[in-house]
Amino acid sequence: MRYRFMAAAAGTVALIVSTQTAPLAAQGRGGRGTPIQAGEQCPPGTTEIRPRSCMAPEFPAPSIIDYRPRNTLKVPEHKVPKAKFPAIDYHAHVGSFLNDAAGLANLSAQMDSLNLGMMVVADNISGDRLKQAVALVSASPTMKNRVRILTGIRFNGVGSPGWAEAAVKQLEDDVAAGAVGVGEIGKGFGLSTRKADGSLLKIDDPELDPVWAAAARLGMPIFIHTAEPEEFFKPIDFNNERWLELSLFNDRRNGPGTGRPTFDDLMAQRDNLFRKHPKTTFVVAHMGWHTADLARLGTMFDEMPNLTAELGAVLYDIGRQPRAAHDFFVKYQDRILFGKDSFQPEEYPYYWRVLETKDDYFDYYRDYHAFWKLYGINLPDDVLKKVYYKNAQRITKGLPTAGFPR
């Protein structure tokens, strides 16, 4: 069975087209296989059955979507429906619950079922909408200490006269209205957001310096999402771990031919911003997309005392390196915040299980993120408390402490 790659237009997925030939499959029967040279990969459609010998399956191969082998491993299981300690979700997109008292009550019930002590709403709520949401929360006897809101920065018009002054004024007004920080600054920042003159807005653009300085003066942490996973900037081929996700979502393709900045370019701009503003507290969403290279994030922590990281939507990496992740979380226990990103209540228990148990080889909740299994990293209680709530309370003024164990 032989295959060839078909050329793909920029931003599209390359397809593999079968040109099956019976002789190759037949050569594999009887145990001989098709020989390859040392260091050479097997041809597409075949697998290495012995050193330097490849064979094609006799049965038609399923697609990556349809291959769902049953887990036959018999090991202890510890399902964790509720967090061991009340958790602050620092990456909560629950703005849709803040329209009326009924929505807020619905959110409260779902938080109770998961032992979520507080939501930090990262929906860039500002101005009159912020005032309305704060008033709704403040009027609720059960939720007034369980929801806090981040404001946003409107990047439209960066570079035009008076933009920076207006942005700083908006931050000041929003702090007065009850905002406790800024964010989530979305992935378009640095990747696609344009200045007033049409040029690409860089993350470390000096036009933005007054805003970051104002955040430091106001005591507002900046919650920032930069770029995407590094694989999203790589060629879309069958060596890419995120092939399935990239084939499903065309807006996540940033690789060669798309005209987008490179992953390393974006990370360099981001890190330069953090260094330029050492008095400003920055929280990188998704652990900065460095969970596949924890040493890189550790170096950032060592060099940048103003930096904290939130762990939303990267559980697939944390849970596949349990020993390394355990050691990293223990070493940098003061620098990591719990966060989830999309509000899907049935997915939170996977986070509790990875963080709290030492379970082996269990399913992840979203196939297109990861085709591998997860392992628990078994964090000690004192570390869990910091990750779940203490670190968020320390870096963010205005987060209540009542109801959280000390």
Predicted segments, located by residue:
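C-terminal segment of classical bacterial N-terminal signal peptides
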Residues: L15-P23
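N-terminal pre-domain segments of enzymes
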Residues: Q27-F85
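Active-site gating/metal-coordination segments in enzymes
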Residues: P69, Q132-R253
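Acidic (Asp/Glu)-rich catalytic clusters
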Residues: K79-K82, L107-S113, Q132-V147, K169-A179, ...
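Divalent metal-dependent hydrolysis catalytic cores, especially in the metallo-beta-lactamase
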Residues: A87-H93, N106-D128, R146-R154, V180-K187
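Histidine-centered divalent metal-coordination motifs
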Residues: H91-G95, H225, H286
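Acidic-and-aromatic substrate-binding clefts and catalytic sites of carbohydrate-active enzymes
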Residues: G95-G103, V121-Q132, N156-E165, K202, ...
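H/E-rich (His + Asp/Glu) clusters that bind or coordinate divalent metals
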Residues: N254, T258-R406
